A protein has these predicted regions:
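A cross-taxon signal for low-complexity, glycine/charged-rich
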Residues: 5, 15-18, 24, 28-32, ...
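Extreme N-terminal basic, low-complexity initiation segments
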Residues: 2-7, 11
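Intrinsically disordered, low-complexity polyampholyte segments enriched for Lys and acidic residues
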Residues: 2, 28, 40-43, 47-48
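Multi-pass alpha-helical transmembrane bundle typical of ion/small-solute transporters
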Residues: 48-399
Length: 399
């Protein structure tokens, strides 16, 4: 099956329902500045085309207070994601003393920016899956209000967990928040697209298995290949290698989590134009840049408590082990992103660290920290989902 490198968000969403991609290699598409409307779309899709240039967006923003709130909440969630989730990418690099905390945070900010911007242009199918996961109904005004509630619930839950230094899964929070709001506005589970919802859960579970297995396998291979290398020379090499691995992990964090929230913001823009679907439209460049910058700013704030929890408390790592964990995590995220599977970057990285620790001995893993993290992830679905449900009901009564 051949597919274009840059796929339209709507093309994927429309064709995913039929279990296939819509693709015509070599097809020409007219260029219109920051937004391109693909011509090879299913019949009737172009009727939903809307102007998503920055000028049009600014005009909509000025006259629509609900859109202002939606955009503010979305950017707030992206910022919090950079603050709370991105430190996972550099935790091992800091705890093995390859880089100082602030150096690592600034490096992560740069590569998170590049990950969001570059990967969304290459393959935006992760954003598609997220935007297609729930149905807020035909009333786009109410849908926009419910989306506001979902986003606020994610911020509240994530900030609360971060204050106590508990690693959070923004992917879990996003799914729970959107689902709670959709159930509230539809009055039941009819607002949930279970085909997409279950696919996302499969991806989250897969991240655990792939992360652990790849971490264990890569570390085992490195241990065998480097067993005759002098320790000082190995440490010099793995210091550089781990910095590169942390940069790659940061890039893939931006690619995965950035796309998820771009998909949500894109859906909010569609609601503000009276459309309940984003089928047939590509993500504009200005939107990619905006989300990239905000995630980079959130990352620059840093989350030193989370770095300590993930990198120091879970497993005591040496430099080669930190490199193996970063390489395994980045590889799993790349695989998932290329196939459009939204996964938890937190799950992937922490399970890779556990896999690396298991090579030496199972007792090297601090199971108390692992247990706390698993309980946090388990509570995210009902906790964040309930907050979103209640907020959606309140918001719809107010507006």
């Amino acid at each position: 099956m051949e597919t274009r490198g840059i796929s339209a968000l709507g093309c994927f969403a429309a064709s995913a329902r039929q279990g296939r991609f819509v693709s015509r290699p070599g097809a020409q598409r007219p260029h219109c500045g920051l937004l391109c409307a693909p011509m090879d779309l299913p019949k009737g899709v172009l009727n939903n085309f809307m102007d998503l240039s920055f000028t049009s967006f600014w005009g909509q923003l000025v006259g629509n207070p609900i859109l202002i709130i939606t955009v503010a909440f979305t950017l707030g969630v992206i910022f919090v994601n950079g603050w709370t989730d991105a430190p996972n990418a550099i935790a091992t690099c800091v705890t093995t003393r390859c880089l100082g905390v602030r150096q690592a945070i600034w490096m992560s900010a740069l590569f998170n920016f590049l990950g969001v911007f570059v990967m969304t242009q290459i393959n935006s199918s992760v954003a598609s899956t997220i935007s297609n996961m729930v149905d807020f109904g035909a009333d786009t005004s109410s849908a926009l209000i419910a989306l506001c509630a979902a986003l606020l619930s994610i911020v509240v839950y994530s900030v609360g967990a971060s204050i106590f230094g508990i690693p959070t899964s923004e992917s879990h929070s996003l799914i729970a928040g959107l689902s709670g709001a959709a159930i509230a506005i539809q009055g039941g589970v009819g607002g949930i697209n279970f085909n997409e919802w279950v696919k996302v859960l499969y991806g989250l579970a897969l991240s655990l298995l792939l992360g652990f297995a790849s971490g264990w396998l890569i570390c085992k291979l490195v241990t065998i290949l480097c067993r005759n290398i002098e320790l000082r020379a190995a440490n010099r090499f793995f210091r550089v290698a781990q910095i590169a691995g942390a940069a790659g992990m940061s890039f893939m964090h931006g690619a995965q989590d950035g796309q998820k929230f771009i998909g949500v913001l894109f859906l909010g823009l569609a609601f503000s134009h009276g459309q309940n679907s984003v089928a047939g439209m590509e993500i504009p460049v200005w939107l990619m840049l905006l989300c990239s910058v905000v995630m980079a700013l959130g990352t620059s704030v840093g989350g030193e408590k989370i770095i300590k929890s993930v990198g120091m408390d879970m497993v005591k790592l040496e430099r080669y082990q930190g490199f193996c964990a970063d390489l395994a995590g980045a590889a799993c995220l790349l695989f998932s992103s290329l196939f459009g599977i939204p996964v938890s970057t937190t799950h992937t990285k922490t399970s890779a660290i556990m896999g690396v620790g298991a090579v030496k001995r199972l007792s090297a893993i601090n199971y108390g920290v692992v247990k706390d993290m698993m309980l946090t992830w388990i509570f995210t679905f009902p906790g964040c989902g309930l907050i979103s449900f209640v907020m959606a009901k309140i918001f719809m009564q107010i507006w």
